[in-house]
Amino acid sequence: MIIGIVAGIVIGAALTYATGLAKLFLAPYGSSAEYKGSESATAPDLATGEWINSEPLKLADLRGRVVLIDFWTFGCYNCRNTLPIVKSWNDRYRPRGLTIIGVHSPEFDDERKVENLRREITSLGIRYPVVTDNDYQIWNAYKVEAWPTVFLLDKQGRIRWMHVGEGDYKEAERLIQKLLAEEPPLENK
C-alpha cells in the first residue's frame, strides 16, 4: 500500500515536471488562444516600472484603442525573431488605432540594467513604448510563462487573444484588423 502511494506521488511529480518542460520547450513553436465575449477578462494594468519611448501609460487611458502587449527580453533569441513583425505592425497600424507596449521582463542580470535596455532598444530600432518589469509584477499579473508572449486587448481593455512563442503572425494580424474595425465603447464615442 505504501509503495502504491509513493509510486503515485512520484508519477504525479514526474507528470507535473514534464508538463512544465513541455511548456518551456514548445514555446518557440507557438500556442495561441482567442477569447470571445464573456471569456475575455479585463487586462491587469501595467505596474509601475521605468518607461522608455513614452511617459507612463495606463490601460484605462488607452480605452478606444487596440493594445498589443509584448512580453520580451533583449537576450531572448525568439523575442528577437518576433521584433521585425511587431515593429511592422506598429508602423502599419498605429495610425489606425493600435498601441504596442513592450514589457521587458529580464531573464539575466545584465538585462535588468536600464542603460543596457536603452542601448538595445535603440540598436533594435524599437520606437513604441517599453516598460521595465524587473520585479515581474506585470509578468505575474498576466500569468506569463515564457518569452515571447503577446496579448491583444480590444478597445474596452479586455484580453481577446494571447500567443506564446514565435509564429501565428497571420492570425495575429487578422485579429488586429478585426479589433480595429470594432466599434469603440460608448464612453469613447
Roles of regions detected by a PLM:
Residues 120-128, 132-177:
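Thiol/disulfide oxidoreductase modules built on the thioredoxin-like
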Residues 22-60:
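N-terminal "domain-start" segment that seeds a small globular fold
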Residues 60, 77, 109, 160, ...:
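Nucleotide phosphate-binding site architecture
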Residues 44, 77-78, 84-88, 129, ...:
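Proline-centered helix-kink/hinge sites
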Residues 80-124, 131-140:
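Structural microenvironment flanking redox-active thiols in thiol-disulfide oxidoreductases
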Residues 63-67, 95-99, 125-129, 155-158:
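Loop/turn elements at helix/coil->beta-strand transitions in domains of secreted/extracellular proteins
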Residues 1-26, 174-189:
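Non-globular targeting/processing and membrane-anchoring segments
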Residues 57-80, 86, 100:
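Short active-site neighborhood of thiol/selenol oxidoreductases, capturing the structured segment around
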